[in-house]
Amino acid sequence: MSTTISTQRGQVYIGELPQDFLRITPPQQQQQVQLDAQAAQQLQYGESLGTVRRLSITVVQAKLAKNYGMTRMDPYCRVRLGYAVYETPTAHNGAKNPRWNKVIQCTVPPGVDSFYLEIFDERAFSMDDRIAWTHVTIPEGLREGSVVDEWYSLSGRQGDDKEGMINLVMSYANMTAGMHMSPPVVLMPTVYQQGVGYIPIAGVPTVYNQGMVPMGMPAAPTVAPQEAPCSEEDLKALQDMFPNLDREVIRTVIEAQQGNKDAAINTLLQMTEEL
C-alpha cells in the first residue's frame, strides 16, 4: 500500500503504486470495438489462436470424353494449391473411367480460395501427356462444417468443359499451427506435353509427391495431426448402411464431422440422395 507525503514540490507517492497509476481507461464502447475488430480479423483468415485451416480433398473418379492412349491409358491427377503440388496414384488401365479414391490433406494459405487440377496419362517411354484440367473454387459452405460432393467439368483438347467430369469430395477441418503433413520429397522442374489452353509458368520450380509438399521450406520432423476419432467399428457400420459409397469417402465424412456419427449419417444421406 502506498503512502502520501508532502515535499517542497508537492505531494509524492511512496511505496507500491496502484495498478491503474497514470493509465487512462478507455470507455467500454471502445473496448468492445477493439474486441470486435480482433474477432473479425480471426474470421477473415479462417483461424483462431494457433490453428490453421486444413482442406481435405477426396479425388474419387473421373469420366473422360476420350481415350488418348495408343493401347491403354493410365491416368493420374495433380492438384496445385498455393505453392504446393499433390498427386494421386496412377489408375493403371483406367482409360476413360479412372477411379482413385485418394484423400489429399493440405493446408490453405491465407488469401487462397481455389486450386488447379490436372489429369495426366502416365507414359513409360515418353513424357506424360496432359489430357484434362479444371480450376476449382473452394466452396464457401465448407467454412460452416459441411461436406461438398460435386462433379466438375474438365477442359482439354475437345474444348472448354468438354473433356469429361471429375468427382471431388471436399471438407474443412482445423489443425494446430506448425504441424506438417509430410516433409518435401522431390524437387524438380515440370516437363510434359502441353495441351490446348495451357499457359506454362516460367521460372517456378514444381514440388510434387503423393502427399503434401510445401515449396521452399526445409524438411521438418513429421508430426501426426490430431484426427477426429474414427473407429473401425463405426466405419464398418456406416459402410454397411451405405454400400454404394466408397470406404475412403465415408472415412472422410466421419473425420470432417469430428467423429459425430449422427452428423456423419445425415451428411451421407444427403450425398446418396444426390447420386
UniProtKB/Swiss-Prot annotation:
Q: Where is the CUE domain?
A: 230-273
**SUPFAM superfamilies registered for this protein in UniProt:** C2 domain (Calcium/lipid-binding domain, CaLB), UBA-like
A GO CC term?
cytoplasm
Location in the cell reads: Cytoplasm
One of this protein's GO BP terms?
A: autophagy
Ranges for domain C2 come to 35-152
Q: Report disulfide bridges, numbered on this chain.
A: none
Keywords carried by this UniProt record: Autophagy, Cytoplasm, Immunity, Inflammatory response, Innate immunity, Repeat
Q: Where is this motif: AIM1?
A: 133-136
Q: What is its main location?
A: cytoplasm
Record-linked PANTHER family = TOLL-INTERACTING PROTEIN
Q: How is the quaternary structure described?
A: Interacts with ATG8 family proteins (via AIM motifs), and ubiquitin (via CUE domain).
Q: Domain text from the record?
A: Both ATG8-interaction motifs (AIM1 and AIM2) are required for the association with ATG8 family proteins.
The name of this protein is Toll-interacting protein B
